Every structure is written in structure tokens, then in C-alpha cells.
């Protein structure tokens, strides 16, 4: 499986991989498929992602009034976080590190949503903005499991 380091090494000359931390890669709930292996083509910098990141599509009629497409984290993130006190912090560290490490990404191909050309913004900025969008979810999770 691609989430295994040995398999990733087979493609290491061409691709970089990242697996989210703090969430269950395979959830016991079949509706929750928030984790995925993110792959970045080394030469082009293009990121391919299944479920972890989504692209919010703006209908053409609304593009004059709403911000351009942007990255968001999967809406079921809260259900995918591991049931322990440090899961939210581990997810934040992973996402922040990914944003910094892959900041020069020009395009994100997000399965089930859209292809996002990062123009006028950058990957780091959008991932950090997406992280801000799930801040309450992460804080609720942290508080819920802090006492356990």
C-alpha cells in the first residue's frame, strides 16, 4: 500500500509523500475517509490529494462576489482525529510543516472536487488558512480528550 514507507521509496525519485498525523488513516466508520497519502511531483511541484484537502469550487455566477477557489480540510476531520489528547496538536504540526515544506506548490489536484491553480496566493498561505477554518474542531477535540 502507498502509505507504507517501503512502497513510497519505490517512487521516491519522482514523488514526495506526506501522511497526516493525529488522524486514523483507516477509520472504523466507513463514512469517514479523511486521511490520504498526499503526493507531490518533485519536478513540477504539483500536489495530488484524495480526501485530506478539498478545493471549494465557486460557481461562475458567484465568482465576482466570492473569493477565488481555496483549499479546505475535509469536513469530517473531527470524526477522523485519534481519540487522544495530543491528536489535534499532531495534526496542526503536520499541516503547518506540510504548508512550509511544500510552499512553492503551483497546483493542487484534489480528488472529488477540483484542480486549483495557486495564483495570487501560495500553498503555505492557503493551508494555514484552511487550518484556521478547522480551529474550533481541533480545539473541541483537544478539550474533550484532555481530561482522559
Model-identified regions with their sequence ranges:
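Metallo-beta-lactamase
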Residues: 1-146
Amino acid at each position: 500500500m502507498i502509505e507504507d514507507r517501503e512502497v513510497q521509496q519505490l517512487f521516491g525519485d519522482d514523488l514526495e509523500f506526506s501522511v497526516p498525523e493525529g488522524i486514523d488513516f483507516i477509520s472504523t466508520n466507513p463514512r469517514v475517509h479523511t486521511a490520504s497519502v498526499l503526493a507531490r511531483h518533485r519536478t513540477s511541484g504539483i500536489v495530488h490529494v484524495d480526501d485530506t484537502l478539498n478545493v471549494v469550487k465557486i460557481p461562475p455566477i458567484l465568482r465576482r462576489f466570492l473569493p477565488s477557489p481555496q483549499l479546505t480540510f475535509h469536513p469530517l476531520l473531527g470524526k477522523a482525529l485519534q481519540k487522544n489528547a495530543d491528536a489535534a496538536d499532531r495534526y496542526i504540526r503536520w499541516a503547518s510543516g506540510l504548508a512550509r515544506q511544500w510552499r512553492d506548490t503551483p497546483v493542487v489536484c484534489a480528488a472529488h472536487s477540483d484542480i486549483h491553480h495557486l495564483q495570487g496566493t501560495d500553498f503555505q498561505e492557503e493551508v494555514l488558512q484552511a487550518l484556521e477554518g478547522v480551529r474550533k474542531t481541533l480545539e473541541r477535540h483537544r478539550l474533550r480528550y484532555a481530561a482522559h
